[in-house]
Amino acid sequence: MPTTQQLLRKGRKVLQKKSKVPALKGSPFRRGVCTVVKTTTPKKPNSALRKIARVRLSSGFEVTAYIPGEGHNLQEHSVVLIRGGRVKDLPGVRYHIVRGSLDTQGVKDRNKSRSKYGTKKPKAGAAAAKK
């Protein structure tokens, strides 16, 4: 415990909070170009082929980002928008690609949680024709 005199002289040091998404540099989103698009397997006990992309950002960083949803149209040199948000069972993946913006298309035939996957509202006739 410091004395009152020591506190007057030095004061308390404020701890700096470490960013969980340093590559965004304080922005909500960043634009980037895909360098590699591949699949990887998650940690135990999960099993799947998760789609990920290595992205070179406008901030100069190169990060690994997750591609959410079923199916995607990304390939090398695709321009994508990145947001923060880790994937719990993929170590080192701390960013998500935003679906439905820039070169990334929205998820096809998605009806629920459409805004999260960049899917436009289906036409009234199209929904009736499917049934």
Curated annotation (Swiss-Prot):
GO terms for cellular component: ribosome; small ribosomal subunit. Residues 9-20, 113-131 have a biased composition (Basic residues). PROSITE patterns: RIBOSOMAL_S12 (PS00055). Pfam families: Ribosom_S12_S23 (PF00164). GO terms for molecular function: rRNA binding; structural constituent of ribosome; tRNA binding. Transmembrane segments: none annotated. InterPro entries: NA-bd_OB-fold, Ribosomal_uS12, Ribosomal_uS12_bac. Residues 1-22, 102-131 are annotated as: Disordered. The modification 3-methylthioaspartic acid is found at D89. CDD domains: Ribosomal_S12. GO terms for biological process: translation. Keywords: Methylation, Ribonucleoprotein, Ribosomal protein, RNA-binding, rRNA-binding, tRNA-binding. Signal peptide: none annotated. Belongs to the universal ribosomal protein uS12 family. Part of the 30S ribosomal subunit. Contacts proteins S8 and S17. May interact with IF1 in the 30S initiation complex. PANTHER family: 30S RIBOSOMAL PROTEIN S12 FAMILY MEMBER (PTHR11652). With S4 and S5 plays an important role in translational accuracy. Interacts with and stabilizes bases of the 16S rRNA that are involved in tRNA selection in the A site and with the mRNA backbone. Located at the interface of the 30S and 50S subunits, it traverses the body of the 30S subunit contacting proteins on the other side and probably holding the rRNA structure together. The combined cluster of proteins S8, S12 and S17 appears to hold together the shoulder and platform of the 30S subunit. This is Small ribosomal subunit protein uS12.
